[in-house]
Amino acid sequence: MLKKIFIIISLYLSLIFSVNANIDIKARTAILQDFLSGEILYEKDPDRSIYPASMTKIMTSIIAFDLIKSGDLSLDDKFIISEKAWRLSTAGYSSMFIMVGDEVSVEDLLLGIIIASGNDACIALAEGIAGTEEEFAILMTSKAKELGMENTNFANSSGINDPDNYSTVRDILIMSNYLIKEHPKYYEWFAEKEFTWNRTGGDPITQGNRNPLLYKNIGADGIKTGYLAVEKYSLASSINRKGRRLIAVGSGFETKSSRSRESSRLLTYGLTN
C-alpha cells in the first residue's frame, strides 16, 4: 500500500515539474494554456484567491455579448448615464468620461470598457442591462458558475476593490477561453490600440489600450490588464502566431514593467513547449 502511495505521489510531482520546467515567472500566481489542445503548459499557484481588478471587465463584456448573440440586446441600443456612473469618471479611476444624462450606445460603452478600461462605462452598461449594478453582478457570478469558475464571485462590474469580488488565474483563464471561443468577432476589439469617444458637449477623447503586449511584436491580440494596490499588477493575455493560440493569466506582478516583461516571457516560452 505504501509503495502505491509513493508511486502516485512521485507521478504527481513529476507532472508538476514537467509543466513548470525551465521557467519561473515573477508573479504570485500564473497559468499558461494552449488554446486548441487545452493543455496547461505552466502553472504557479493557479488556485490562489486574487482580486481580479479590471480583468473583471472580461465578464462584464461577456454578459453583453451573450445578450447580443441571443437577440436581447443590440449594439445600437442606448443607455442614459446615471450620476453613479458619472461619479466614477471624476474619482480618479480609469474612465471613458461619460456625463450624466448622456445617451450612449452599447457599442460605445463596450469599446470604452475594453479599450479605455472605463469603470464609468461598466456601471452604465450594468445599469442599462440589469437595472442596478448589484443585479448585474448577480448575472456575472451566475455566468461564472455556469462556466465552471468554481472559485469566483463578482460584486461589481468594474473590478474596483471589494473583498467580495474575487477569483483565481485558473478561473480567469476559463473566462478568457469562453470569450475567444464564443465571441470571436467581438474579441477582435480587444486588439484595438485606441478608442475615440465623441462625447457630448466637448472635444473627442482618444485613449490608448492599456495592454502593453499589443505594442510588442509577439502576436498579442488581447486581453485585459488589471491593477489594485492590494493585488499589484495583473494581466490576462493571448497571442496567436502561426495558427497557434496561447492564453496566459498572471497576478501579483510588482510593477507595470515586470507585468509586461514576465507575461511576454511566459507566452514566448509557451511557443516552444
Write out the residue ranges for each language-model feature:
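Bacterial N-terminal signal peptides
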Residues: I8-I16
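Active-site-adjacent loops and short helices of periplasmic peptidoglycan-processing enzymes
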Residues: V19-R170, N177-K181
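General helical structural elements
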Residues: I7-I8, L228
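Positively charged n-region of N-terminal signal peptides that target proteins for export
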Residues: M1-I5
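Domain-terminus/edge residues, biased toward the C-terminal soluble/receptor-binding domains
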Residues: M149-N153, N161-N273
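Short, intrinsically disordered, charge-balanced linker/junction segments flanking boundaries
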Residues: F17, A21, L271-N273
